[in-house]
Each structure stands twice: as structure tokens, then as C-alpha cells.
């Protein structure tokens, strides 16, 4: 009976260790995805800002001519 308890304990322990390793890898993958999303948002914000500046400059030039 003691042998079965030790075996069961060992199986449960190894299962918990493998689960914790998988969780760590999952967190790292999620962090990498978050970094990519932040970079995409940064590029889009730059493009939007440049577009707004370009439109404002064009409107300013048109207003000067009128």
C-alpha cells in the first residue's frame, strides 16, 4: 500500500511540475504577443499623426490662396 501511495504522489508531483512549466511558457508567449500589439499601435498612431499634419498643412495652404 505504501508503494502505491508513493507512486501516486510521484505522478501527481510530476503532473504539477509539468503544468507549472506550461503556464510559464504560456505567459511568455502572451507577453511577446502584447509587445507586438504595442508596436502595431505605435506605427498606426504615427501614421495617423502624419496624416493629420499633412491635411492641416494642405488646408492651411488652401486658406492662404483664398
Swiss-Prot record:
GO terms for cellular component: extracellular region. This is Ocellatin-PT3. Keywords: Amidation, Amphibian defense peptide, Antibiotic, Antimicrobial, Cleavage on pair of basic residues, Secreted, Signal. It comes from Leptodactylus pustulatus. InterPro entries: Antimicrobial15, Frog_antimicrobial_propeptide, FSAP. The keyword Lipid metabolism does not apply. Residues 1-22 form the signal peptide. Its main location: secreted.
Amino acid at each position: 500500500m505504501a508503494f502505491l501511495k508513493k507512486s501516486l504522489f510521484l505522478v501527481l508531483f510530476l503532473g504539477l511540475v509539468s503544468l507549472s512549466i506550461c503556464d510559464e511558457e504560456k505567459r511568455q508567449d502572451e507577453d511577446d504577443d502584447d509587445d507586438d500589439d504595442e508596436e502595431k499601435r505605435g506605427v498606426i498612431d504615427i501614421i495617423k499623426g502624419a496624416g493629420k499634419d499633412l491635411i492641416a498643412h494642405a488646408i492651411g495652404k488652401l486658406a492662404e490662396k483664398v
